[in-house]
Amino acid sequence: MQFQKSIRIDADTDTVWDVVAHQFDAVGEWSSAVQSSGPNPEASTPEGATVGGRVCATDFGDLKETFTAYSEENKRFTFEVTGMPSFITKAQNTVTVKPAGANASEVSLNILMETNAIGKIMAPMFKIRLTSTLNTFLDELKDYAESGTVSAKKQKQLAKAAA
């Protein structure tokens, strides 16, 4: 399965790159798809990156995301995900940040997943859920990169976790 999603963000590429790359391990601070996140101490840090990967608490369980490619110059990185449901045998995501006009950026996600036989049967349902999650993720990234504030959904999640 392959998914491609992108969004235009009204913030310069350096600002957006800082959020998605330099604050890679802090995704749990603004994305409601991630209850909490932190650096993956087992991952080697690529040149230019602040961490080698992250560990995310999600509805799927704890996921480890580790950089497999990273380019500050091209504002592009790829990470591999482990800890997915057992029917997913490989998951990786390539994130690219490009200029999209004056003081604007385009963030592209290119996700590749390989599945076993059970995964092929479950793929249509999983694709619907993942598409919804990715749309919310990109909308929340846009809000956070443009304003520095988290979505109402994430605010509720953080308040519930603090209670």
Predicted segments — roles?
Residues 1, 59-63, 89, 103:
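Short acidic/polar mixed-charge low-complexity motifs
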Residues 1-46, 162-163:
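Hydrophobic ligand-binding cavity/cleft-lining segments
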Residues 5-7, 64-69, 91-99:
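Hydrophobic/aromatic beta-strand elements that line small-molecule binding cavities or substrate pockets
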Residues 13, 20, 60, 127, ...:
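A structural signal for well-ordered alpha-helical scaffolds and beta->alpha junctions
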Residues 13-14, 69-74, 96-106:
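A short, structured loop/turn motif at beta-sheet edges
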Residues 28, 38-86, 136, 140-147, ...:
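Glycine-rich portal/gate segments that line the openings of hydrophobic small-molecule binding cavities
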Residues 82-136, 143, 152-154:
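Beta-strand/loop substructures that line and gate deep hydrophobic ligand-binding cavities in soluble
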